[in-house]
């Protein structure tokens, strides 16, 4: 049989005793430090979780708005625009206010000759 060695570990705690108005308060500094670290840890984790949730919501909203924008101004609306432009409309021609301007006359003549 071999030698068995056992070790005992003693934990020493710093205990603070204070009295105020004839009341005794005993607190362990190790416990209070643990509580402070625990509160800081929980607050940090809470902030990280809140930021992650905000990031996910932002990404979802961004994807939704991008798809909506593509539908309104993208490929699907090009066919609608070409349909609207191919149909003749009686309200397309607007008479210019300044008819004596030669640039307006040339532009109107070039537009009328193209159609």
UniProtKB/Swiss-Prot annotation:
Keyword Membrane included in the entry's annotation: yes
Domain of life: Viruses
Membrane topology: Single-pass membrane protein
Main localization (coarse): host cell
Bilayer-crossing regions: 39-59
Keyword terms of this UniProt record: Host membrane, Membrane, Transmembrane, Transmembrane helix
Subcellular compartments: Host membrane
Entry's Gene Ontology cellular component terms: host cell membrane; membrane
Family of this protein: Belongs to the rotavirus B NSP1-1 family.
UniProt protein name: Non-structural protein 1, peptide 1
């Amino acid at each position: 049989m071999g030698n068995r060695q056992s070790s005992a570990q003693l934990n020493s705690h710093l205990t603070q005793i204070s009295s105020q108005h004839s009341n005794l308060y005993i607190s362990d500094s190790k416990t209070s430090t643990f509580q402070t670290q625990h509160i800081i840890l929980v607050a940090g984790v809470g902030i990280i979780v809140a930021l992650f949730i905000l990031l996910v919501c932002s990404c979802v909203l961004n994807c939704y708005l991008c798809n909506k924008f593509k539908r309104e101004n993208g490929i699907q609306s090009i066919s609608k625009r070409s349909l609207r432009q191919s149909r003749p409309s009686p309200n397309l021609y607007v008479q210019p206010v300044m008819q004596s301007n030669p640039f307006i006359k040339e532009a109107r003549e070039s537009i009328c000759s193209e159609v």
